[in-house]
């Protein structure tokens, strides 16, 4: 299977990891704030 545009796959991977990073930061912020205000 040949991929004529490997750059597009790299961009998609970076975008996906960026979304996962933001989601992780959001979850950690919620847990941290609930731990502080409890």
UniProtKB/Swiss-Prot annotation:
Listed Pfam families: PsbL (PF02419)
Name the UniProt record assigns to this protein: Photosystem II reaction center protein L
Keyword Plastid in annotation: yes
Gene that this sequence comes from: psbL
Entry's Gene Ontology BP terms: photosynthesis
Organism: Ostreococcus tauri
Top-level taxon of origin: Eukaryota
Any one of the GO CC terms: photosystem II reaction center
Family annotation (HAMAP family): PSII_PsbL
UniProt function note: One of the components of the core complex of photosystem II (PSII). PSII is a light-driven water:plastoquinone oxidoreductase that uses light energy to abstract electrons from H(2)O, generating O(2) and a proton gradient subsequently used for ATP formation. It consists of a core antenna complex that captures photons, and an electron transfer chain that converts photonic excitation into a charge separation. This subunit is found at the monomer-monomer interface and is required for correct PSII assembly and/or dimerization.
Main location: plastid
Compartments reported by the entry: Plastid, Chloroplast thylakoid membrane
Leader peptide range in chain numbering: none
Quaternary structure, from the entry: PSII is composed of 1 copy each of membrane proteins PsbA, PsbB, PsbC, PsbD, PsbE, PsbF, PsbH, PsbI, PsbJ, PsbK, PsbL, PsbM, PsbT, PsbX, PsbY, PsbZ, Psb30/Ycf12, at least 3 peripheral proteins of the oxygen-evolving complex and a large number of cofactors. It forms dimeric complexes.
């Amino acid at each position: 299977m040949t991929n004529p545009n490997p750059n597009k796959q790299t961009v998609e991977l970076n975008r996906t990891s960026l979304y996962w990073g933001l989601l992780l930061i959001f979850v950690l912020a919620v847990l941290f704030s609930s731990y502080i205000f409890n």
